[in-house]
């Protein structure tokens, strides 16, 4: 777990995540083989907020779609990543799938991509990282995400974009607490 220690996650949270995600069926009718729908992600975000409001878990969430989903120093995604949150984002790598963005570093997004990839990417600036298995396994420059096509790590067409920002309210930082000093 990245945002929470394993002991902090109630079994119901894991059960409900598994129950509500992977809700799309393949052409052959196999459940879960076409991933998770946008409706399920919106529902999951609302469900996490309710869990936080009830005090069951110190979690909050925000569902983003369309033009709100982009990468830049001013974006809500980058804001979340810079203040202790994560972003579950739908993007492309051969096909649409979700990745977990966990940080920002030197114009790159640190992310965990569940798709196994053992060969270096053709794009030499996309790096596979095996040294941080609890935080990220890819380092991807900002420039790939904001494309409106279906190329590697692009967020795709504006109207189809989606992200869920998630925070652990115990570790979330507010902008006033994050001070950078320039010499």
Regions found by a protein language model. Name each.
Residues 46-62, 90-103, 125-137:
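Hydrophobic transmembrane alpha-helix bundles
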Residues 32-36, 69, 93, 167:
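Alpha-helix N-cap/loop-to-helix boundary motif
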Residues 62-121:
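Active-site-adjacent substructure of cysteine-protease-like catalytic cores
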Residues 41-46, 73-77, 151:
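Intrinsically disordered, low-complexity boundary segments flanking structured domains
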Residues 1-65:
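Cysteine-nucleophile protease catalytic domains, especially the papain-like/related folds used
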Residues 14-15, 73-74, 159, 175:
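Short amphipathic alpha-helical segments that mediate assembly, nucleic-acid/protein binding
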Residues 3-4, 77, 164, 180:
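Generic low-polarity alpha-helical segments
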Residues 82, 104-183:
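Noncatalytic regulatory segments and standalone regulatory/sensor domains
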